[in-house]
Amino acid sequence: MSQIGVAGVDLAAAEPGLAAWLAAGFHGSMHYMARHGLKRARPAELVPGTASVITARMDYLPRDEGGRWIDDEEAALADPRRAVVSVYARGRDYHKVLRSRLQRLAERLATEVGPFGHRVFTDSAPVLEVELATRAG
């Protein structure tokens, strides 16, 4: 993981912004956004008993990739003869990679502190990931 943080689950301050965003129709054709509504700002409704959320960030490229990759990507994008696959879509599905690593993290934590309830999400649940990650630092 590139970064790990912990956040509380009280996202009440984010609810008005989420409600306004949905009311304005900014979710477009992503109907699931409206379907879950304000539940996204209430992690404890999704997993009852939730007291904290561990957030994790994983970079798409390894650190030893060097700084030239951005230049290489921009050159490829500027060439109309080339098709470019987004960086996140190359290699193994990041959902599976993150899910596996987060599950291992939960198991290691349980070894240290004892069993605890948890559920691993990787862009797969109706939660405000960015809000939680921001609060987690």
Please identify what each model-predicted range represents.
Residues 1-137:
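Auxiliary alpha/beta "docking" domains used to position bulky ligands
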